[in-house]
Amino acid sequence: MKDELDMNANLLVEFLQKPSAEFTKADIVSYIKEKNIRMVNFMYPAGDGRLKTLNFVINNAAYLDAILTCGERVDGSSLFSFIEAGSSDLYVIPRFRTAFIDPFSELPTLSMLCSFFNKDGEPLESSPEYTLHKASKAFSDVTGMQFEAMGELEYYVIADEEDLFPATDQRGYHESGPYAKFNQFRTQCMQYIAQAGGQIKYGHSEVGNFTLNGKIYEQNEIEFLPTRVEDAADQLMIAKWVIRNLAYEYGLNITFAPKITAGKAGSGLHVHMRIMKNGKNQMLANGILSETARKAIAGMMCLASSITAFGNTNPTSYFRLVPHQEAPTNICWGDRNRSVLVRVPLGWAAKTDMCALANPLEPASHYDTSQKQTVEMRSPDG
């Protein structure tokens, strides 16, 4: 636990010295008072996939307690196409574990993601966050295990073309400056996302890099660490919001579109998954892919058409899912293969202590690498 709190980038975790999963209303109030926070934002995804925001000025302590406890009502028909205007009122209730400081607000502002509730005070059955929660709970109830996930968030930065140090077309993977033009933008995005609670694995420039009609198109990626599947989804929502807002401040344009033009790399939203039990990764057994992992992969193969229906709702997805573009075109799986539907990436299964080999002064590490193995669904995007 101490290792998770030390050097934690989340500003509230750093102050409260507890993981975000343990945040209480009293913790939120304490932080607001100590840091002289003047506003609170409720944020929640709508049917268009964007985060919506409701602003509150903290009038006094009683009002703060009221909004944190009772939430607020909103017009569901303006958020979701499946809700009729004749009976559209919904409640939005903040989830304290998602609290973060808004890096873009001039006034000190604390934001939280919210859950939707219906008129009877019950979770809205068709809301995005509750649908995911039900699926996660059903998995745990049936298997006795926990489903964890993380996303690879790919996007293009679009800016005016420049002549200095031009990048090589479609050779932008892990490129450094000055050939990669937007490393500073990406690292600032990563800083803001981490301060908001995002568990980031790494960031880098991606393959896609081209010019078109006087504009530079540079592809980048921010990848996360495996976590509870509901938290993984929350982190992706906040990350997209951060990237768009920071791009606006920089005077840049951003797109998460699956495909911009033919022959150039598309942007996916690859999802890595692992199955946990009692804190142990169940994806490996004796250094090879476990029966549990193989059953999970088989399930993804069987449900490929349904997964595609939900994971590829943008028509341009189907210009991305073409041969020779590191995108799946067949229902199959394989080790280390970026053209299959489900990829089994390198998982540090070899017993070699590579750190000690690269650094002869280091003692044997005895690091448990079994936690690192995942499988990756490569079809989703958007």
Q: Can you annotate each of these PLM segments?
A:
Residues L113, E152-P166, N209-E223, A257-G279:
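Histidine-centered divalent-metal-coordination microenvironment in nucleic-acid enzymes
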Residues K137-G144, Q191-G198, N245-L252, N278, ...:
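Generic secondary-structure signature for well-ordered alpha-helical cores
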